[in-house]
Amino acid sequence: MGDAADPREMRKTFIVPAIKPFDHYDFSRAKIACNLAWLVAKAFGTENVPEELQEPFYTDQYDQEHIKPPVVNLLLSAELYCRAGSLILKSDAAKPLLGHDAVIQALAQKGLYVTDQEKLVTERDLHKKPIQMSAHLAMIDTLMMAYTVEMVSIEKVIACAQQYSAFFQATDLPYDIEDAVMYWINKVNEHLKDIMEQEQKLKEHHTVEAPGGQKSPSKWFWKLVPARYRKEQTLLKQLPCIPLVENLLKDGTDGCALAALIHFYCPDVVRLEDICLKETMSLADSLYNLQLIQEFCQEYLNQCCHFTLEDMLYAASSIKSNYLVFMAELFWWFEVVKPSFVQPRVVRPQGAEPVKDMPSIPVLNAAKRNVLDSSSDFPSSGEGATFTQSHHHLPSRYSRPQAHSSASGGIRRSSSMSYVDGFIGTWPKEKRSSVHGVSFDISFDKEDSVQRSTPNRGITRSISNEGLTLNNSHVSKHIRKNLSFKPINGEEEAESIEEELNIDSHSDLKSCVPLNTNELNSNENIHYKLPNGALQNRILLDEFGNQIETPSIEEALQIIHDTEKSPHTPQPDQIANGFFLHSQEMSILNSNIKLNQSSPDNVTDTKGALSPITDNTEVDTGIHVPSEDIPETMDEDSSLRDYTVSLDSDMDDASKFLQDYDIRTGNTREALSPCPSTVSTKSQPGSSASSSSGVKMTSFAEQKFRKLNHTDGKSSGSSSQKTTPEGSELNIPHVVAWAQIPEETGLPQGRDTTQLLASEMVHLRMKLEEKRRAIEAQKKKMEAAFTKQRQKMGRTAFLTVVKKKGDGISPLREEAAGAEDEKVYTDRAKEKESQKTDGQRSKSLADIKESMENPQAKWLKSPTTPIDPEKQWNLASPSEETLNEGEILEYTKSIEKLNSSLHFLQQEMQRLSLQQEMLMQMREQQSWVISPPQPSPQKQIRDFKPSKQAGLSSAIAPFSSDSPRPTHPSPQSSNRKSASFSVKSQRTPRPNELKITPLNRTLTPPRSVDSLPRLRRFSPSQVPIQTRSFVCFGDDGEPQLKESKPKEEVKKEELESKGTLEQRGHNPEEKEIKPFESTVSEVLSLPVTETVCLTPNEDQLNQPTEPPPKPVFPPTAPKNVNLIEVSLSDLKPPEKADVPVEKYDGESDKEQFDDDQKVCCGFFFKDDQKAENDMAMKRAALLEKRLRREKETQLRKQQLEAEMEHKKEETRRKTEEERQKKEDERARREFIRQEYMRRKQLKLMEDMDTVIKPRPQVVKQKKQRPKSIHRDHIESPKTPIKGPPVSSLSLASLNTGDNESVHSGKRTPRSESVEGFLSPSRCGSRNGEKDWENASTTSSVASGTEYTGPKLYKEPSAKSNKHIIQNALAHCCLAGKVNEGQKKKILEEMEKSDANNFLILFRDSGCQFRSLYTYCPETEEINKLTGIGPKSITKKMIEGLYKYNSDRKQFSHIPAKTLSASVDAITIHSHLWQTKRPVTPKKLLPTKA
């Protein structure tokens, strides 16, 4: 074990990591972490990152994450930016970057601007506290982009791609950095594919000459051998499909393309076999690849990958810049630096990669070695045992680590995630499709056929069973899915799979599995050594995708080898690639297994089970006949599927015995068993619950479970993988089940809680198993009864026919043909009986044959609807039940006559062919006919002979009591189907037909859809397998009666031998037709055609067509020599057509006999034919009506859909129009409102202008009186000026109120006048106008004296109080004419100033104006603009703050301590005033707010 577990490999083994679910993944935190990790690494160097900066986050006591203060400080201080920027931007050492602004400027010089949500990031943003993280992320992203641009450019990428791709299209060239990175990845990966293709061609060339397998006398065997044994050759043709990268983030989440890129540059560090390349990547597969990439970057690229697994897996768009910089770093390493380990891959000739050197190359898994790595040194089965116990919980689907490839690259097997056996993952195991992780199909069509696997993915065999269902959409229907490989999610104690590690883990193994052909030959029986090896059930998919665990191809081949004494066995390459070899220690069991395997039972069983597997669906009935003789549609036979169920029980017996032995000998079978059914501690897909839960079982229980596992998929239609919870699902540790087997993986054995669960599962399974067996036994009884009944029916029907025809004389030809058929039938019956005596095998063989030969018989029992097989077995016709010795003797004599007529029938073939041509012409006139090519008589005869020799061949089957079975390969499959349909329709008039044993059958076919050659189909339920198309010779009965009774007897014998069921189901005509078919197919080997033709003319019918069996019609015709296919419209004259058919059938049988043969034997009744014709016409009419109705319905449906679509479009259009109208109306109303408001404003201004103009005179008169005011104002040095400043009305100025001024009590008249002309605005406010509009009106009125004319409305500025101060000066501080000079000067100073904010300085709380100051809120500086007072005022000097109230035209005291932009006036402490200054008279004190 130690040699297998290389410590380095162990270290590189990946465990399925615990990742955060998508719902819990914090994208913003991930972005911050990625950016900071990159920035810190670039600032300090990867090796020198301070410890406190390695993890930027810390968690507080409330479990909340925050960025560490040191990191925040470094960001705020710009140290990280300056360090990284100096490196990235290559700034001058003499002029290092200092501060955020320097870095921003340096980036700007490169054409990169730091923007956060389309806003330029400034140094102020980067200095903000608390830290504004979005600005810093934008800064780091810009630095990343600068680094990316330095490392990668479009020119560099194109130059690099030119090394690997000579051809360029202008449209392909990248247009930006991101596109350039994707272009580089795709070009390199394309080049890698080309290299692999070239290497593959070399390998193919090298392996073409290698023997693919041993020839066998059986053509069936020979056809199977290449596909199975040459699996390596076919698998070589599959290249890993490295996905194209079209979206850098989303297409990189599985790591396939990136890992392939790394492999190309570092093929010795990251081998292609170590990369998980699959069509459908599971979560674990993606994580595996991403871990592989991360580990590579960690070890070789200076830790340039600053992502977590979640970052790469979820690929948020926010980390695109991080991903780009990572790819740029890769490009720099691979294309610029090119360290020693970077050695771009080149085409390596065959054998250039020494296998033995592989251990020295870093490998990702201890279990990856190929069996072929060394011919003598095999890793022991316990390879994975040294893995730590903490890993033992890995779900089984991730635990199959074998990711190895042979030196020739045969089969790459990647474990889905961990490559480690016995670890548990962090996500629950999901139910998956029944095919677990096997990505290939086995095609047996041709030796050189390429196996169809999931499209061109690199890992042709993935051990992951998640998401790797067989791509049935890409697999042809006939490619059977025989998954002979070990199911993937089985957890073995030791990772070695039988295919790869062909040695037992125990040291007592006497020898290793031979690796060369000679050794394999000498150990021919090696395949039998393990019951659960090649011979144990494999996962087989039936037509419905359910698992049927049946023997695999290799098992069948091995059985054939054993029975046929074939000397050769597959080569080591093929063994390693999937042929399961087992250690010689099991040779003791060879005899036991051989008994079962070589027994005819097992041979046939295996073949039967495999029949659905072969691509052309050839069914081997126990004798290897040419492939042409094997019917093609066996895979559709439900009875065959049923048969495979019983088959497995036999297969189980040997394996059970071996299992018991295995357990007793303490052999670690798990290490060697690729079979799902092995009862091991690994919860394999087919393993029982007990095995998954680690309960030790007795051999009896084990047998029960093995059997259960076999039948789970088959009987229940679902794989045991789905029904049996695996250990990982049950959270039960996987434990070694047998005490004798040492624990190699060191997994804990939890047998307390797990035993309870397991024992319950055991009981459940036992009950199910008993039920299954009871059902199976009943089924077998039914089948046996059915077989006996068929034999009885055959004999009875034949004797009945003989009796009825006893009076007539049949022509020698007919006698000969009939005799031959009967003879063959009896021979076949005898063979069948002898086979049945052999035991289960013969019984199953007979069942297969019966199912093949007697689909019709089953139908006849159930004329129109499929009947439960059990019920079908019991059906029998009354005439067939009466059987006596005399009849049997007559039957035997008739067979002899048939033999003698064989030669004569051959001579008749020429004449029949002429007749066929005539009939074909008529058919063309009357109906649509599709006639398959008619095989030559020699070929058919030849086919007949081998089948006859085989005794079990399909050709002989028709003569047996079984219903006819076609011996012809492909044409028959189609023919069979149509014929089967005809049988079904004919069966409807069954009561009458039973009376008239054989003739009416031909007419019924036209009734059904089958009458249309292309439309003919048989429902599988009705005809499980139509192995042979039926030749319907319509009037067999009539002509035969005339010609000779013996010939009719012969024909009827044929019919009966083919299927007495047919006789029961069909009228005599049917039977005769069938006999002809059998004679034709067997003796004349005429192609049996499914088309049932109604012969339109009695004349043609009258023409003798004795050997209708001979292909009078092309393959379609042989079946219905007398039948002419008539189109539904042509079926109108059914009577006439039917009669000719009947006659013609008879006449075709006795072609030599002319019109005198028109005599109708009891089998032909014209009335019945007419009735059938009528029915056929009715059915045709019904069918036409139905078709017409369907077409009309379809048309109506289409019309309705079109109307609905039109209505929807109309509704959509109307809705859009309405929406547009509403928007237009809204816009129009808004415009009208705005216009109205504008006009109203102008009008108000004009009104106020006219009202205010006379006002100054009144004011003057009234103001003359208070002389103190005049004095007060005159004394002030500044004179007011008329209102240019007031003309620009701002929002501030408009906010003045309309209250009366309270400068002095003597102002009341003025205030009254003001109130008078403020009334319009008040009315407006009553009408709902905005208050600010009222205010503007008021202010404009108040400043009416200075207003010189209409002014444009100006939107007030929110940041300036300039207009408020102007208002205050004009209406409060320096109001009146006296102060006009002073006011004018002050306003002029204000206009000159650039300041936005002004402050008025009052002397004290009396609000006497002293001076005007400018105020800067940013710097909080207060400087004098004009007036008396200190040059500048500081915060400490301020005593009170005042706000101007425009409504009341006075200042209000603000009880605040902090100066802000909303303050309009201030006072300073009184001690700051010089008392010597003349004191101005006090004004009226304003009211304090």
Swiss-Prot record:
The keyword Mitochondrion does not apply. Residues 703-713, 1039-1075, 1132-1152, 1191-1252 have a biased composition (Basic and acidic residues). One of its GO terms (cellular component) is ciliary basal body. Residues 375-415, 611-639, 668-730, 812-844, 925-1017, 1032-1078, 1096-1152, 1191-1349 are annotated as: Disordered. Its main location: cytoplasm. Residues 405-415, 680-699 have a biased composition (Low complexity). One of its GO terms (molecular function) is microtubule minus-end binding. GO terms for biological process: axon development; cytoplasmic microtubule organization; microtubule cytoskeleton organization; negative regulation of microtubule depolymerization; regulation of dendrite development; regulation of Golgi organization; regulation of microtubule polymerization; regulation of organelle organization. Residues 756-793, 887-926, 1166-1238 form a coiled coil. Residues 1105-1117 have a biased composition (Pro residues). Residues 1349-1483 form the CKK domain. Keywords: Cell projection, Coiled coil, Cytoplasm, Cytoskeleton, Golgi apparatus, Microtubule, Phosphoprotein. Residues 668-679, 960-989, 1287-1299, 1334-1346 have a biased composition (Polar residues). It comes from the Eukaryota. InterPro entries: CAMSAP (IPR032940), CAMSAP-like_CH_dom (IPR022613), CAMSAP_CC1 (IPR031372), CH_dom (IPR001715), CH_dom_sf (IPR036872), CKK_dom_sf (IPR038209), CKK_domain (IPR014797), PRC_barrel-like_sf (IPR011033). It holds the Pfam family CAMSAP_CC1. The modification Phosphoserine is found at residues 416, 418, 464, 598-599, 611, 673, 680, 862, 931, 936, 1008, 1019, 1148, 1313, 1319, 1321. It is found in: Cytoplasm, Cytoskeleton; Golgi apparatus; Cytoplasm, Cytoskeleton, Cilium basal body; Cytoplasm. Residues 222-335 form the Calponin-homology (CH) domain. Interacts with CAMSAP3. Interacts with KATNA1 and KATNB1; leading to regulate the length of CAMSAP2-decorated microtubule stretches. Interacts with a complex formed by AKAP9 and PDE4DIP isoform 13/MMG8/SMYLE, which recruits CAMSAP2 to the Golgi. Interacts with MAPRE1/EB1. The CKK domain binds microtubules and specifically recognizes the minus-end of microtubules. Key microtubule-organizing protein that specifically binds the minus-end of non-centrosomal microtubules and regulates their dynamics and organization. Specifically recognizes growing microtubule minus-ends and autonomously decorates and stabilizes microtubule lattice formed by microtubule minus-end polymerization. Acts on free microtubule minus-ends that are not capped by microtubule-nucleating proteins or other factors and protects microtubule minus-ends from depolymerization. In addition, it also reduces the velocity of microtubule polymerization. Belongs to the CAMSAP1 family. It is linked to Defects in CAMSAP2 may be a cause of susceptibility to epilepsy in the Chinese population. This is Calmodulin-regulated spectrin-associated protein 2. It comes from Homo sapiens (Human).
